[in-house]
Design a protein with these regions (language model features):
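Positively charged n-region of N-terminal signal peptides that target proteins for export
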Residues: 1-5
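Bacterial N-terminal signal peptides
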Residues: 7-17
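A short beta-strand-turn-helix
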Residues: 23-45, 65
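Short pre-active-site segment immediately N-terminal to redox-active cysteine/selenocysteine motifs
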Residues: 43-45, 49-53, 83
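Conserved redox-active cysteine motifs that mediate thiol-disulfide chemistry
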Residues: 49-66
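Structural microenvironment flanking redox-active thiols in thiol-disulfide oxidoreductases
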Residues: 61-97, 110-114
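Short, internal strand/loop/helix patches
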Residues: 94-125
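Thiol-/selenol-based redox modules, centered on thioredoxin-like
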Residues: 125-161
Length: 161
């Protein structure tokens, strides 16, 4: 009886792993900044810090994913502010939203993380930053949920700078 349950469990684990198209990496703000610098000269970057428990984050999330899929000069990077013990929940949500590639979950204390992402960020979620394609510098940032039109304006500016 134990062997069939083991095989069933292993099959489920392999199936779940095969369905996952996102690499969720627990890391600190310094490593995230280093990752973002790789896109300078190649793509504009939209960095979105969110959490599964944040209603405005969850509301705007599908729109951000859609923009990332639509606009080829844009790299969308998601950073979860959830706690380490929510790793499974975060990965499941990212897979539900069909996020691919690399996403991050913070693994440093809140204040160090906030200061490392942006010195003018007060910690409210969602938090969004746009980095210029050419310059690689921060051009625009905001706290809170915003409209698709505001995102599109910021993306266009980031692609051109």
């Amino acid at each position: 009886m134990r062997l069939p349950l083991f095989v069933l469990g292993l099959s489920f684990l392999l199936l779940f792993s095969a369905c996952s198209n996102v690499d969720l990496i627990a890391t600190d703000s310094k490593t995230i900044q280093e990752h973002l610098s790789n896109y300078k000269g190649e793509k504009a970057v939209l960095l979105n810090v969110w959490a599964t428990s944040c209603a405005p984050c969850v509301e705007e999330f599908p729109m951000i994913v859609s923009l990332g899929n639509e606009i080829k000069d844009l790299e969308v990077v998601f950073v979860s502010a959830d706690f380490d013990d929510q790793l499974g929940e975060v990965k499941s949500y990212l897979n539900e939203q069909k996020v691919t590639g690399v996403s991050f979950i913070k693994n440093e204390n809140d204040q160090s993380f906030i200061n490392g992402i942006h010195p003018e960020w007060f910690g409210s979620l969602p938090f969004t930053i746009f980095y210029g394609k050419i310059s690689g510098k921060i051009l625009i940032f905001w706290e809170g949920k915003e409209s698709e039109s505001k995102f599109r304006e910021a993306i266009q500016r980031a692609i051109n700078e």
